[in-house]
Amino acid sequence: KILSAAERLFAQKGYAKTTLQDIIDTTGLSKGAVYHHFKSKEEIAAKVGDRLGARVAAELARIRDDAALTGLQKLQTVFAVSLLPGRQQQLQHMLPHLCDDPQFFTMEYHDLLETTVPLYITPMIRQGVADGSIQTESPEALGEAIFLLADLWLNPQTRPTTPARQRARCAVFQQMTQALGLDLLTDEQAEELAALCEAE
């Protein structure tokens, strides 16, 4: 109940403008009841982030297990879903403080290499090798390289920049992945990422 209320408030008002009192008022619980579960707004935000992460994992599992798609199509779908219009903006609005938190980067890096890539991305790449849609001798290394770049460098939420610099990043990412035969980031998706950035 507390996390659902917090997630709604973060989405509506943004993290910065949501107070712990707002969350308490929305739940109808006493201050003591909320403090029994959570010590701070930051702790609530971390749990909201965990819930969002669980939804992402379910989406990745659905894509990985979709028998109708080739390995390459699965990777393209991962990019399309993660860059859906509105999804990035919602995350940026809800949890903007994460890009300033070194602990978040450490957790994100660990989660990517220990969970996301081995459980979801590598199987998609292995399938792509088997069905001929992806050429690589190192599915694990390819998955790690692409998704570390995408998540920690290409993503303007984790590495804020200007629209012009974001377009340059997208162009380099497209050149690199296309050289590997992987058409992952469309021009429209690149423009959506640039639109998330603030001009200098």
Model-derived regions, located:
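Short secondary-structure transition hinges
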Residues: 84-134
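Conserved hydrophobic residue
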Residues: 16, 29, 130, 134-135, ...
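Hydrophobic alpha-helical connector segments
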Residues: 47, 51, 61-92, 143-146
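Short, well-structured alpha-helical segments
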Residues: 76, 122, 139-147, 190-194
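Hydrophobic/aromatic residues within well-ordered alpha-helical segments
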Residues: 48, 52, 56, 78, ...
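All-alpha amphipathic helical-bundle segments outside canonical DNA-binding/catalytic cores
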Residues: 72-73, 112-113, 126-145, 163-168
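Helix-turn-helix
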Residues: 1, 5, 9-43, 47-51
